[in-house]
Amino acid sequence: MNTAFAGFDENRAGRRAPGCTGRPAFGLGMDSQQDVVNLDQGGCCPALRKLLPRGFWDEARALFVLSGPLFLFQVLNFLTYVVGTVFCGHLGKVELASVTLGVAFVNVCGVSVGAGLSSACDTLMSQSFGSPNKKHVGVILQRGSLILLLCCLPCWALFLNTQHILLLFRQDPAVSRLTQDYAMIFIPGLPAIFLYSLLAKYLQNQGIVWPQVLSGVVGNCVNGVANYALVSVLNLGVRGSAYANTISQFVQAAFLFLHIVLKKLHLETWEGWSSQCLRDWGPFLSLAIPSMLMMCVEWWAYEIGSFLMGLLGVVDLSGQAIIYEVATVVYMIPMGLGMAVCVRVGTALGAADTLQAKRSAVSGLLCTAGTSLVVGTLLGLLNSQLGYIFTSDEEVIALVNQVLPIYIVFQLVEAVCCVFGGVLRGTGKQAFGAIVNAIMYYIVGLPLGIVLTFVVGMRIMGLWLGMLTCIFLAAVTFVVYAVQLDWKLAAEEAQKHAGLQQQQQQQQQQGAECTAPSPGPDKAVVSSVATGCNPGIALTMYSRPGCHVDFYGRPEAAPAPAAPASRLSVRQLLFRRGAALAASVAVLMAGLLVRVLTTGY
Protein backbone atom coordinates (compact mmCIF):
# COMPACT_ATOMS: atom_id res chain seq x y z
CA MET A 1 0.00 0.00 0.00
CA ASN A 2 1.33 3.41 -0.92
CA THR A 3 1.38 6.12 1.71
CA ALA A 4 1.40 9.88 1.42
CA PHE A 5 2.97 12.26 3.92
CA ALA A 6 2.30 15.88 3.05
CA GLY A 7 5.55 17.65 2.33
CA PHE A 8 7.79 14.88 3.67
CA ASP A 9 10.21 12.62 1.81
CA GLU A 10 9.07 9.24 3.04
CA ASN A 11 11.12 7.19 0.64
CA ARG A 12 14.46 8.39 1.95
CA ALA A 13 13.42 7.78 5.55
CA GLY A 14 12.17 4.28 4.86
CA ARG A 15 14.82 3.06 2.38
CA ARG A 16 16.99 0.15 3.46
CA ALA A 17 20.26 -0.89 1.94
CA PRO A 18 20.20 -4.35 0.35
CA GLY A 19 21.42 -7.03 2.65
CA CYS A 20 21.53 -4.75 5.66
CA THR A 21 22.10 -6.74 8.83
CA GLY A 22 23.26 -6.00 12.31
CA ARG A 23 22.12 -5.43 15.84
CA PRO A 24 18.63 -4.08 16.52
CA ALA A 25 18.34 -0.32 16.75
CA PHE A 26 17.32 1.32 19.96
CA GLY A 27 13.58 1.74 19.72
CA LEU A 28 10.05 1.26 20.92
CA GLY A 29 9.46 -2.38 20.19
CA MET A 30 11.11 -2.19 16.78
CA ASP A 31 11.46 -5.23 14.57
CA SER A 32 15.07 -6.31 14.55
CA GLN A 33 14.77 -7.39 10.93
CA GLN A 34 13.53 -4.01 9.76
CA ASP A 35 14.88 -1.34 12.07
CA VAL A 36 18.58 -1.97 12.08
CA VAL A 37 21.64 0.14 11.61
CA ASN A 38 23.99 -0.88 8.85
CA LEU A 39 27.26 -1.36 10.68
CA ASP A 40 29.10 -1.54 7.38
CA GLN A 41 28.29 2.08 6.62
CA GLY A 42 31.16 4.50 6.69
CA GLY A 43 31.34 7.46 8.97
CA CYS A 44 32.47 8.31 12.43
CA CYS A 45 31.11 7.20 15.79
CA PRO A 46 30.06 3.65 14.83
CA ALA A 47 29.12 2.97 18.45
CA LEU A 48 26.70 5.90 18.38
CA ARG A 49 25.21 4.79 15.08
CA LYS A 50 24.17 1.51 16.70
CA LEU A 51 21.69 3.47 18.82
CA LEU A 52 20.08 5.26 15.89
CA PRO A 53 17.19 3.82 13.88
CA ARG A 54 17.59 3.60 10.12
CA GLY A 55 16.65 6.87 8.46
CA PHE A 56 17.19 8.82 11.69
CA TRP A 57 18.81 11.87 10.09
CA ASP A 58 16.08 12.23 7.47
CA GLU A 59 13.43 11.79 10.13
CA ALA A 60 15.17 14.28 12.44
CA ARG A 61 15.27 16.79 9.60
CA ALA A 62 11.54 16.32 9.01
CA LEU A 63 10.81 16.73 12.72
CA PHE A 64 12.83 19.94 13.03
CA VAL A 65 11.23 21.34 9.85
CA LEU A 66 7.87 20.87 11.58
CA SER A 67 8.84 21.75 15.14
CA GLY A 68 10.76 24.95 14.34
CA PRO A 69 7.72 26.90 13.12
CA LEU A 70 5.59 25.31 15.84
CA PHE A 71 8.04 26.63 18.45
CA LEU A 72 7.78 30.12 16.94
CA PHE A 73 4.00 29.77 16.92
CA GLN A 74 3.96 28.99 20.66
CA VAL A 75 6.31 31.89 21.41
CA LEU A 76 4.08 34.29 19.50
CA ASN A 77 1.03 33.09 21.42
CA PHE A 78 2.93 33.65 24.66
CA LEU A 79 3.97 37.16 23.62
CA THR A 80 0.33 38.13 23.09
CA TYR A 81 -0.19 38.04 26.85
CA VAL A 82 3.25 39.39 27.75
CA VAL A 83 2.67 42.60 25.78
CA GLY A 84 -0.45 43.46 27.76
CA THR A 85 1.36 42.75 31.03
CA VAL A 86 4.22 45.08 30.04
CA PHE A 87 1.89 47.97 29.19
CA CYS A 88 -0.17 47.58 32.37
CA GLY A 89 2.96 47.10 34.48
CA HIS A 90 3.78 50.78 34.01
CA LEU A 91 0.40 51.84 35.43
CA GLY A 92 0.90 50.55 38.96
CA LYS A 93 1.02 47.46 41.16
CA VAL A 94 -2.74 46.95 41.22
CA GLU A 95 -3.02 47.13 37.44
CA LEU A 96 -0.06 44.77 36.97
CA ALA A 97 -1.49 42.27 39.45
CA SER A 98 -4.94 42.55 37.85
CA VAL A 99 -3.85 41.90 34.27
CA THR A 100 -1.57 39.07 35.42
CA LEU A 101 -4.37 37.47 37.40
CA GLY A 102 -6.82 38.13 34.56
CA VAL A 103 -4.63 36.32 32.05
CA ALA A 104 -4.15 33.43 34.48
CA PHE A 105 -7.90 33.15 35.15
CA VAL A 106 -8.81 33.28 31.46
CA ASN A 107 -6.17 30.67 30.68
CA VAL A 108 -7.16 28.26 33.44
CA CYS A 109 -10.95 28.57 33.07
CA GLY A 110 -11.14 29.06 29.31
CA VAL A 111 -8.12 28.79 27.05
CA SER A 112 -6.76 25.60 28.64
CA VAL A 113 -10.14 23.90 28.22
CA GLY A 114 -10.30 24.72 24.51
CA ALA A 115 -6.65 23.85 23.92
CA GLY A 116 -7.12 20.52 25.66
CA LEU A 117 -10.32 19.58 23.85
CA SER A 118 -8.89 20.57 20.47
CA SER A 119 -5.96 18.21 21.09
CA ALA A 120 -8.27 15.37 20.07
CA CYS A 121 -7.72 16.70 16.56
CA ASP A 122 -4.03 15.82 16.88
CA THR A 123 -5.08 12.17 16.85
CA LEU A 124 -8.06 12.25 14.52
CA MET A 125 -6.81 14.70 11.90
CA SER A 126 -3.29 13.32 11.57
CA GLN A 127 -4.54 9.76 11.26
CA SER A 128 -7.25 10.73 8.77
CA PHE A 129 -4.81 12.76 6.69
CA GLY A 130 -2.42 9.83 6.52
CA SER A 131 -5.21 7.59 5.24
CA PRO A 132 -6.86 7.65 1.79
CA ASN A 133 -9.91 9.22 3.48
CA LYS A 134 -8.54 12.77 3.63
CA LYS A 135 -11.97 14.41 3.36
CA HIS A 136 -12.67 13.10 6.85
CA VAL A 137 -10.28 15.79 8.17
CA GLY A 138 -12.82 18.45 7.19
CA VAL A 139 -15.60 16.59 9.00
CA ILE A 140 -13.46 16.46 12.14
CA LEU A 141 -12.89 20.23 11.88
CA GLN A 142 -16.64 20.80 11.66
CA ARG A 143 -17.33 18.48 14.59
CA GLY A 144 -14.63 20.09 16.72
CA SER A 145 -15.94 23.59 15.94
CA LEU A 146 -19.45 22.73 17.14
CA ILE A 147 -18.24 21.04 20.32
CA LEU A 148 -15.80 23.80 21.26
CA LEU A 149 -18.35 26.53 20.62
CA LEU A 150 -20.73 24.74 22.99
CA CYS A 151 -17.96 24.58 25.58
CA CYS A 152 -17.66 28.37 25.46
CA LEU A 153 -20.95 28.72 27.34
CA PRO A 154 -19.87 27.01 30.61
CA CYS A 155 -16.58 28.94 30.45
CA TRP A 156 -18.53 32.18 30.12
CA ALA A 157 -20.48 31.24 33.26
CA LEU A 158 -17.17 31.22 35.15
CA PHE A 159 -16.06 34.49 33.54
CA LEU A 160 -19.27 36.17 34.72
CA ASN A 161 -18.41 35.33 38.33
CA THR A 162 -14.67 35.97 38.26
CA GLN A 163 -14.71 38.47 41.11
CA HIS A 164 -16.66 36.22 43.48
CA ILE A 165 -14.45 33.23 42.69
CA LEU A 166 -11.29 35.23 43.39
CA LEU A 167 -12.71 36.63 46.62
CA LEU A 168 -13.38 33.06 47.77
CA PHE A 169 -9.63 32.52 47.45
CA ARG A 170 -9.00 35.67 49.49
CA GLN A 171 -7.60 37.78 46.68
CA ASP A 172 -7.38 41.56 47.03
CA PRO A 173 -10.83 43.14 46.39
CA ALA A 174 -9.47 45.89 44.11
CA VAL A 175 -7.48 43.38 42.08
CA SER A 176 -10.47 41.03 41.91
CA ARG A 177 -12.72 43.80 40.59
CA LEU A 178 -10.33 44.74 37.77
CA THR A 179 -9.76 41.07 36.97
CA GLN A 180 -13.53 40.71 36.63
CA ASP A 181 -13.50 43.53 34.07
CA TYR A 182 -10.73 41.80 32.12
CA ALA A 183 -12.59 38.48 32.01
CA MET A 184 -15.90 40.09 31.02
CA ILE A 185 -14.33 41.95 28.11
CA PHE A 186 -12.58 38.78 26.94
CA ILE A 187 -15.88 36.82 26.71
CA PRO A 188 -16.30 37.37 22.93
CA GLY A 189 -12.62 36.58 22.41
CA LEU A 190 -12.98 33.02 23.72
CA PRO A 191 -14.78 31.60 20.64
CA ALA A 192 -12.19 33.31 18.45
CA ILE A 193 -9.29 31.69 20.27
CA PHE A 194 -11.05 28.29 20.23
CA LEU A 195 -11.61 28.46 16.46
CA TYR A 196 -8.08 29.74 15.93
CA SER A 197 -6.75 26.75 17.84
CA LEU A 198 -8.81 24.38 15.68
CA LEU A 199 -7.67 26.00 12.43
CA ALA A 200 -4.06 25.76 13.60
CA LYS A 201 -4.56 22.05 14.35
CA TYR A 202 -6.23 21.63 10.96
CA LEU A 203 -3.12 22.90 9.16
CA GLN A 204 -0.56 21.50 11.57
CA ASN A 205 -1.77 17.93 11.16
CA GLN A 206 -1.39 18.26 7.40
CA GLY A 207 2.24 19.31 7.83
CA ILE A 208 1.43 22.98 7.10
CA VAL A 209 2.91 25.22 9.79
CA TRP A 210 4.09 28.59 8.45
CA PRO A 211 0.62 30.21 8.09
CA GLN A 212 0.19 29.89 11.86
CA VAL A 213 3.47 31.72 12.40
CA LEU A 214 2.43 34.46 9.99
CA SER A 215 -0.93 34.86 11.71
CA GLY A 216 0.87 35.07 15.07
CA VAL A 217 3.10 37.87 13.76
CA VAL A 218 0.06 39.78 12.49
CA GLY A 219 -1.82 39.21 15.75
CA ASN A 220 1.09 40.45 17.86
CA CYS A 221 1.50 43.56 15.72
CA VAL A 222 -2.19 44.37 16.12
CA ASN A 223 -1.99 43.58 19.84
CA GLY A 224 0.97 45.91 20.36
CA VAL A 225 -0.64 48.80 18.48
CA ALA A 226 -3.98 48.26 20.23
CA ASN A 227 -2.36 48.16 23.67
CA TYR A 228 -0.49 51.37 22.97
CA ALA A 229 -3.63 53.12 21.73
CA LEU A 230 -6.02 51.85 24.39
CA VAL A 231 -3.75 51.67 27.44
CA SER A 232 -1.20 54.46 26.93
CA VAL A 233 -3.13 56.95 24.78
CA LEU A 234 -6.77 56.51 25.82
CA ASN A 235 -5.84 55.53 29.41
CA LEU A 236 -8.28 52.62 29.58
CA GLY A 237 -5.93 50.65 31.82
CA VAL A 238 -6.67 46.97 32.37
CA ARG A 239 -9.84 47.24 30.29
CA GLY A 240 -7.83 48.56 27.37
CA SER A 241 -5.46 45.61 27.60
CA ALA A 242 -8.41 43.21 27.59
CA TYR A 243 -9.91 44.93 24.54
CA ALA A 244 -6.55 44.73 22.76
CA ASN A 245 -6.20 41.02 23.53
CA THR A 246 -9.72 40.31 22.30
CA ILE A 247 -9.18 42.25 19.07
CA SER A 248 -5.91 40.45 18.39
CA GLN A 249 -7.58 37.05 18.85
CA PHE A 250 -10.23 37.93 16.26
CA VAL A 251 -7.58 39.24 13.86
CA GLN A 252 -5.50 36.06 14.19
CA ALA A 253 -8.48 33.77 13.61
CA ALA A 254 -9.77 35.82 10.66
CA PHE A 255 -6.32 36.04 9.08
CA LEU A 256 -5.72 32.29 9.32
CA PHE A 257 -9.19 31.50 7.96
CA LEU A 258 -8.75 33.85 5.00
CA HIS A 259 -5.28 32.47 4.34
CA ILE A 260 -6.67 28.93 4.18
CA VAL A 261 -9.47 29.96 1.81
CA LEU A 262 -7.48 32.26 -0.47
CA LYS A 263 -4.52 29.88 -0.73
CA LYS A 264 -6.95 26.99 -1.23
CA LEU A 265 -5.29 24.92 1.47
CA HIS A 266 -8.61 23.24 2.19
CA LEU A 267 -9.30 21.65 -1.19
CA GLU A 268 -7.74 18.29 -0.36
CA THR A 269 -9.58 17.85 2.94
CA TRP A 270 -12.86 19.78 2.67
CA GLU A 271 -15.97 19.06 0.64
CA GLY A 272 -18.45 21.31 2.42
CA TRP A 273 -20.56 21.10 5.53
CA SER A 274 -21.95 17.66 6.20
CA SER A 275 -24.45 16.14 8.61
CA GLN A 276 -21.60 13.79 9.54
CA CYS A 277 -20.32 16.53 11.87
CA LEU A 278 -23.33 15.82 14.11
CA ARG A 279 -22.33 12.18 14.45
CA ASP A 280 -19.58 10.45 16.42
CA TRP A 281 -19.41 13.04 19.19
CA GLY A 282 -18.82 10.20 21.64
CA PRO A 283 -15.56 9.01 20.01
CA PHE A 284 -14.42 12.63 19.66
CA LEU A 285 -15.08 13.40 23.32
CA SER A 286 -13.50 10.10 24.39
CA LEU A 287 -10.25 11.55 23.04
CA ALA A 288 -10.94 15.23 23.74
CA ILE A 289 -11.68 14.94 27.47
CA PRO A 290 -8.54 12.87 28.28
CA SER A 291 -6.55 15.27 26.08
CA MET A 292 -7.89 18.20 28.06
CA LEU A 293 -7.16 16.50 31.38
CA MET A 294 -3.69 15.45 30.23
CA MET A 295 -2.87 19.09 29.49
CA CYS A 296 -4.81 20.85 32.24
CA VAL A 297 -3.73 18.56 35.07
CA GLU A 298 -0.12 19.55 34.43
CA TRP A 299 -0.95 23.21 33.76
CA TRP A 300 -3.02 23.59 36.91
CA ALA A 301 -0.35 21.89 39.04
CA TYR A 302 2.12 24.68 38.26
CA GLU A 303 -0.50 27.33 38.98
CA ILE A 304 -1.12 25.67 42.35
CA GLY A 305 2.62 25.67 42.97
CA SER A 306 2.79 29.41 42.33
CA PHE A 307 -0.14 29.95 44.70
CA LEU A 308 1.66 27.96 47.42
CA MET A 309 4.80 30.04 46.98
CA GLY A 310 2.70 33.13 47.55
CA LEU A 311 1.96 31.83 51.05
CA LEU A 312 5.68 31.95 51.89
CA GLY A 313 6.20 35.60 51.06
CA VAL A 314 7.28 37.97 48.35
CA VAL A 315 10.82 36.60 47.94
CA ASP A 316 9.76 33.00 47.30
CA LEU A 317 6.90 34.14 45.06
CA SER A 318 9.27 36.32 43.04
CA GLY A 319 11.76 33.47 42.69
CA GLN A 320 8.97 31.14 41.59
CA ALA A 321 7.75 33.72 39.07
CA ILE A 322 11.22 33.93 37.47
CA ILE A 323 11.70 30.16 37.30
CA TYR A 324 8.16 29.76 35.97
CA GLU A 325 8.75 32.30 33.20
CA VAL A 326 11.98 30.54 32.20
CA ALA A 327 10.22 27.18 32.33
CA THR A 328 7.41 28.44 30.11
CA VAL A 329 9.80 29.54 27.36
CA VAL A 330 12.02 26.45 27.61
CA TYR A 331 8.99 24.14 27.53
CA MET A 332 8.03 25.44 24.11
CA ILE A 333 11.02 23.67 22.53
CA PRO A 334 10.03 20.10 23.48
CA MET A 335 6.40 21.09 22.99
CA GLY A 336 7.11 21.88 19.34
CA LEU A 337 8.95 18.58 18.92
CA GLY A 338 6.11 16.76 20.69
CA MET A 339 3.61 18.27 18.26
CA ALA A 340 5.78 17.26 15.32
CA VAL A 341 6.08 13.70 16.65
CA CYS A 342 2.30 13.56 17.08
CA VAL A 343 1.75 14.60 13.46
CA ARG A 344 4.32 12.15 12.09
CA VAL A 345 3.16 9.21 14.22
CA GLY A 346 -0.54 9.86 13.59
CA THR A 347 -0.07 10.28 9.85
CA ALA A 348 1.98 7.08 9.64
CA LEU A 349 -0.60 5.10 11.59
CA GLY A 350 -3.36 6.49 9.37
CA ALA A 351 -1.43 5.03 6.44
CA ALA A 352 -0.99 1.74 8.39
CA ASP A 353 2.79 2.25 8.31
CA THR A 354 3.78 1.09 11.80
CA LEU A 355 7.47 1.06 10.91
CA GLN A 356 7.44 4.77 10.10
CA ALA A 357 5.39 5.51 13.23
CA LYS A 358 7.96 3.79 15.45
CA ARG A 359 10.81 5.50 13.64
CA SER A 360 9.21 8.90 14.23
CA ALA A 361 8.69 8.15 17.93
CA VAL A 362 12.29 7.04 18.53
CA SER A 363 13.76 9.85 16.44
CA GLY A 364 11.63 12.40 18.28
CA LEU A 365 12.85 11.09 21.62
CA LEU A 366 16.50 11.34 20.56
CA CYS A 367 16.05 14.83 19.09
CA THR A 368 14.29 16.06 22.21
CA ALA A 369 16.97 14.64 24.49
CA GLY A 370 19.66 16.36 22.40
CA THR A 371 17.98 19.76 22.40
CA SER A 372 17.27 19.54 26.13
CA LEU A 373 20.93 18.80 26.84
CA VAL A 374 21.88 21.91 24.87
CA VAL A 375 19.32 24.02 26.75
CA GLY A 376 20.50 22.62 30.07
CA THR A 377 24.10 23.48 29.21
CA LEU A 378 23.15 27.06 28.33
CA LEU A 379 21.17 27.46 31.55
CA GLY A 380 24.13 26.10 33.51
CA LEU A 381 26.44 28.64 31.91
CA LEU A 382 23.98 31.43 32.78
CA ASN A 383 23.44 30.17 36.31
CA SER A 384 24.80 33.23 38.11
CA GLN A 385 23.46 35.77 35.60
CA LEU A 386 19.95 34.57 34.81
CA GLY A 387 18.27 36.23 37.76
CA TYR A 388 19.64 39.67 36.83
CA ILE A 389 17.58 39.58 33.62
CA PHE A 390 14.41 39.81 35.71
CA THR A 391 15.34 41.66 38.89
CA SER A 392 18.12 43.43 40.79
CA ASP A 393 17.04 42.10 44.20
CA GLU A 394 20.02 40.09 45.48
CA GLU A 395 17.89 37.93 47.77
CA VAL A 396 15.64 36.84 44.91
CA ILE A 397 18.64 36.26 42.63
CA ALA A 398 20.30 34.05 45.25
CA LEU A 399 17.11 32.01 45.53
CA VAL A 400 16.90 31.58 41.76
CA ASN A 401 20.53 30.42 41.66
CA GLN A 402 19.72 27.75 44.25
CA VAL A 403 16.71 26.40 42.36
CA LEU A 404 18.16 26.56 38.85
CA PRO A 405 20.28 23.34 39.09
CA ILE A 406 17.14 21.42 40.07
CA TYR A 407 15.23 22.95 37.19
CA ILE A 408 17.99 22.07 34.69
CA VAL A 409 17.53 18.38 35.50
CA PHE A 410 13.76 18.87 35.60
CA GLN A 411 13.53 20.32 32.09
CA LEU A 412 15.49 17.39 30.66
CA VAL A 413 13.09 14.83 32.14
CA GLU A 414 10.06 16.99 31.30
CA ALA A 415 11.16 17.08 27.66
CA VAL A 416 11.06 13.27 27.57
CA CYS A 417 7.50 13.36 28.94
CA CYS A 418 6.59 15.98 26.36
CA VAL A 419 7.68 13.89 23.38
CA PHE A 420 5.93 10.82 24.78
CA GLY A 421 2.85 13.00 25.14
CA GLY A 422 3.09 13.52 21.38
CA VAL A 423 3.34 9.76 20.87
CA LEU A 424 0.27 9.22 23.06
CA ARG A 425 -1.75 11.80 21.14
CA GLY A 426 -0.62 10.38 17.81
CA THR A 427 -1.70 6.88 18.84
CA GLY A 428 -4.92 7.98 20.55
CA LYS A 429 -3.80 6.93 24.06
CA GLN A 430 -4.49 10.23 25.81
CA ALA A 431 -6.51 8.53 28.56
CA PHE A 432 -3.39 6.77 29.81
CA GLY A 433 -1.47 10.04 29.79
CA ALA A 434 -4.22 11.81 31.72
CA ILE A 435 -4.26 9.10 34.40
CA VAL A 436 -0.48 9.11 34.77
CA ASN A 437 -0.31 12.92 35.00
CA ALA A 438 -3.12 13.04 37.57
CA ILE A 439 -1.47 10.42 39.77
CA MET A 440 2.06 11.78 39.50
CA TYR A 441 1.22 15.46 39.98
CA TYR A 442 -1.56 15.29 42.57
CA ILE A 443 -0.70 12.13 44.51
CA VAL A 444 3.11 12.28 44.30
CA GLY A 445 4.46 15.65 43.15
CA LEU A 446 2.37 18.28 44.92
CA PRO A 447 1.97 16.41 48.25
CA LEU A 448 5.71 15.70 48.36
CA GLY A 449 6.46 19.29 47.40
CA ILE A 450 4.15 20.62 50.12
CA VAL A 451 5.81 18.43 52.76
CA LEU A 452 9.31 19.46 51.69
CA THR A 453 8.28 23.12 51.43
CA PHE A 454 6.35 23.66 54.65
CA VAL A 455 7.23 20.74 56.95
CA VAL A 456 10.90 20.18 56.14
CA GLY A 457 11.38 23.91 55.53
CA MET A 458 13.06 23.70 52.12
CA ARG A 459 10.72 26.42 50.79
CA ILE A 460 10.80 26.83 46.98
CA MET A 461 13.47 24.14 46.55
CA GLY A 462 11.11 21.65 48.20
CA LEU A 463 8.40 22.39 45.64
CA TRP A 464 10.72 21.80 42.69
CA LEU A 465 12.18 18.63 44.21
CA GLY A 466 8.63 17.32 44.50
CA MET A 467 7.95 18.24 40.89
CA LEU A 468 11.21 16.63 39.77
CA THR A 469 10.25 13.39 41.52
CA CYS A 470 6.83 13.24 39.89
CA ILE A 471 8.07 14.09 36.40
CA PHE A 472 10.81 11.44 36.66
CA LEU A 473 8.28 8.76 37.64
CA ALA A 474 5.97 9.89 34.84
CA ALA A 475 8.80 9.65 32.31
CA VAL A 476 9.67 6.11 33.43
CA THR A 477 6.00 5.12 33.17
CA PHE A 478 5.68 6.55 29.66
CA VAL A 479 8.85 4.79 28.48
CA VAL A 480 7.66 1.41 29.80
CA TYR A 481 4.23 1.91 28.24
CA ALA A 482 5.65 2.94 24.86
CA VAL A 483 8.00 -0.06 24.73
CA GLN A 484 5.04 -2.40 25.27
CA LEU A 485 2.71 -0.54 22.89
CA ASP A 486 0.97 -2.69 20.27
CA TRP A 487 1.64 -0.63 17.14
CA LYS A 488 -0.39 -2.89 14.86
CA LEU A 489 -3.43 -2.44 17.07
CA ALA A 490 -2.80 1.32 17.11
CA ALA A 491 -2.78 1.29 13.30
CA GLU A 492 -6.08 -0.60 13.24
CA GLU A 493 -7.62 1.94 15.61
CA ALA A 494 -6.31 4.71 13.37
CA GLN A 495 -8.25 3.20 10.46
CA LYS A 496 -11.39 3.41 12.60
CA HIS A 497 -10.69 7.04 13.49
CA ALA A 498 -10.25 7.83 9.79
CA GLY A 499 -13.60 6.22 8.94
CA LEU A 500 -11.95 3.67 6.66
CA GLN A 501 -13.89 0.69 7.96
CA GLN A 502 -17.18 2.33 7.00
CA GLN A 503 -15.71 3.28 3.67
CA GLN A 504 -14.55 -0.29 3.06
CA GLN A 505 -18.12 -1.49 3.57
CA GLN A 506 -19.30 1.05 1.02
CA GLN A 507 -16.60 0.04 -1.42
CA GLN A 508 -17.52 -3.62 -1.06
CA GLN A 509 -21.18 -2.86 -1.71
CA GLN A 510 -20.36 -0.67 -4.70
CA GLY A 511 -17.77 -3.15 -5.92
CA ALA A 512 -20.43 -5.84 -5.85
CA GLU A 513 -22.33 -3.80 -8.41
CA CYS A 514 -19.21 -3.91 -10.55
CA THR A 515 -19.29 -7.73 -10.41
CA ALA A 516 -22.97 -7.94 -11.32
CA PRO A 517 -24.03 -9.70 -14.56
CA SER A 518 -22.52 -7.95 -17.52
CA PRO A 519 -24.86 -5.30 -18.96
CA GLY A 520 -25.52 -4.65 -22.60
CA PRO A 521 -22.66 -3.53 -24.87
CA ASP A 522 -23.35 0.20 -24.53
CA LYS A 523 -23.70 0.02 -20.74
CA ALA A 524 -20.67 -2.21 -20.46
CA VAL A 525 -18.46 0.44 -22.03
CA VAL A 526 -19.82 3.12 -19.73
CA SER A 527 -19.35 0.86 -16.72
CA SER A 528 -15.73 0.03 -17.42
CA VAL A 529 -14.74 3.61 -18.19
CA ALA A 530 -16.82 5.50 -15.67
CA THR A 531 -15.95 3.28 -12.74
CA GLY A 532 -12.32 2.76 -13.66
CA CYS A 533 -12.62 -1.03 -13.41
CA ASN A 534 -13.12 -3.91 -15.76
CA PRO A 535 -16.48 -5.73 -15.67
CA GLY A 536 -16.30 -8.52 -13.14
CA ILE A 537 -13.46 -6.91 -11.08
CA ALA A 538 -14.21 -5.13 -7.80
CA LEU A 539 -12.33 -1.92 -7.05
CA THR A 540 -10.60 -1.45 -3.71
CA MET A 541 -10.14 1.87 -1.93
CA TYR A 542 -6.45 1.87 -2.79
CA SER A 543 -6.96 2.02 -6.54
CA ARG A 544 -4.67 5.06 -6.48
CA PRO A 545 -2.50 6.38 -3.64
CA GLY A 546 -4.53 8.73 -1.48
CA CYS A 547 -7.31 8.88 -4.06
CA HIS A 548 -10.76 7.43 -4.47
CA VAL A 549 -12.41 6.86 -7.83
CA ASP A 550 -16.14 7.10 -7.39
CA PHE A 551 -18.69 5.26 -9.45
CA TYR A 552 -19.89 8.31 -11.36
CA GLY A 553 -16.62 8.95 -13.12
CA ARG A 554 -15.20 11.65 -10.82
CA PRO A 555 -11.68 10.88 -9.59
CA GLU A 556 -11.27 12.71 -6.32
CA ALA A 557 -9.94 12.43 -2.83
CA ALA A 558 -11.83 9.91 -0.75
CA PRO A 559 -15.04 11.45 0.62
CA ALA A 560 -16.21 11.15 4.16
CA PRO A 561 -18.24 7.95 4.43
CA ALA A 562 -21.98 8.04 4.76
CA ALA A 563 -23.47 6.79 7.97
CA PRO A 564 -24.71 3.21 8.03
CA ALA A 565 -28.45 2.76 8.21
CA SER A 566 -28.20 1.30 11.72
CA ARG A 567 -26.92 4.58 13.14
CA LEU A 568 -28.97 7.39 14.62
CA SER A 569 -31.47 9.10 12.36
CA VAL A 570 -31.24 12.81 11.62
CA ARG A 571 -34.15 13.47 13.99
CA GLN A 572 -32.43 11.59 16.80
CA LEU A 573 -29.19 13.45 16.11
CA LEU A 574 -30.91 16.82 16.20
CA PHE A 575 -32.62 15.91 19.46
CA ARG A 576 -29.36 14.87 21.12
CA ARG A 577 -27.36 17.84 19.87
CA GLY A 578 -30.21 20.12 20.84
CA ALA A 579 -30.09 18.64 24.34
CA ALA A 580 -26.34 19.36 24.48
CA LEU A 581 -27.00 22.95 23.44
CA ALA A 582 -29.75 23.28 26.04
CA ALA A 583 -27.45 21.96 28.76
CA SER A 584 -24.71 24.44 27.83
CA VAL A 585 -27.19 27.31 27.79
CA ALA A 586 -28.55 26.19 31.17
CA VAL A 587 -25.06 26.34 32.68
CA LEU A 588 -24.57 29.83 31.26
CA MET A 589 -27.93 30.99 32.61
CA ALA A 590 -27.08 29.54 36.02
CA GLY A 591 -23.85 31.51 36.00
CA LEU A 592 -25.73 34.66 35.01
CA LEU A 593 -28.27 34.08 37.78
CA VAL A 594 -25.51 33.67 40.37
CA ARG A 595 -23.93 36.92 39.22
CA VAL A 596 -27.23 38.81 39.45
CA LEU A 597 -28.06 37.43 42.89
CA THR A 598 -24.60 38.13 44.31
CA THR A 599 -24.17 41.62 42.88
CA GLY A 600 -23.64 44.04 45.72
CA TYR A 601 -22.24 41.45 48.14
Swiss-Prot record:
UniProt protein name: Multidrug and toxin extrusion protein 2
Species this protein is from: Oryctolagus cuniculus
Broad class of where this protein is predominantly found: membrane
Segments on the Cytoplasmic side according to the record's topology features: 1-62, 117-145, 204-212, 263-281, 342-361, 424-437, 481-577
Alphabetized NCBIfam families for the sequence: matE (TIGR00797)
One Pfam family this sequence matches: MatE
Function noted in UniProt: Multidrug efflux pump that functions as a H(+)/organic cation antiporter. Mediates the efflux of cationic compounds, such as the model cations, tetraethylammonium (TEA) and 1-methyl-4-phenylpyridinium (MPP+), the platinum-based drug oxaliplatin or weak bases that are positively charged at physiological pH, cimetidine or the antidiabetic drug metformin. Mediates the efflux of the endogenous compounds creatinine, thiamine and estrone-3-sulfate. Plays a physiological role in the excretion of drugs, toxins and endogenous metabolites through the kidney.
pH dependence: Optimum pH is 6.0.
Gene name for this UniProt entry: SLC47A2
Cellular component per GO, a single term: apical plasma membrane
Tissue and organ expression note: Expressed in renal cortical tissues.
